Amino acid sequence: MKDKKLQIGIMGSAQDLNYGDALRDLARELGREVARSGNIVVYGAEKDYDSLSTQAARGAKEAGGTTVGVTYGKGKDIWEQEGFTDILIVTGLERGGGREFVLVNSCDAIIAISGGSGTLTEMAIAYQSNIPIVVMSDTGGWAEKLGGTYIDARNRLKAEIAVTPKEAVSKVLELIRQRG
């Protein structure tokens, strides 16, 4: 499966949406960079939030990429925003664990930017599942708190730190390659 497109999850803040233009732009560029690498952006499609993950999906579409939105609830009408989600996976599950489990396990690796409790949950699921994690530095939230660390004493995998979107994508691709 040498030519298989990889599914790169972008996990980021929905929280109170008080992030500034710099984080919004960084998330969009992250999505563009995944698209430029020829891979797929997977993100948590939120009906009621314009999260950093959603910004990454927009960026991917701006660069001609493919996006997969994993949403909560039931029925395809849960997702009303159009134009930047190519494939929608409706889990029938709620936020807070169930939907995040499906989201993360649909990814070959994840990149976290800032992040509240949902991003923390997604990072923990990735860690437990040995799915590579890269975090964007200086973005606040759980990405910054867990960057460069192991989540627990088992030392399964470290949340690697990247400074730029290009570096983040390069790191996830290398981690996936190493993982085999």
Give the positions of each predicted feature.
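Generic N-terminal amphipathic, Lys/Arg-enriched alpha-helix
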Residues: K4-Y19, E33-I40
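Acidic/glycine-enriched connector segments
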Residues: R28, R32, R36-G38, Y43-I125
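Short, hydrophobic alpha-helical segments
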Residues: V172-G180
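Short, charged/polar "capping" segments at the starts of alpha-helices
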Residues: N18, K76-W79, G141-K145
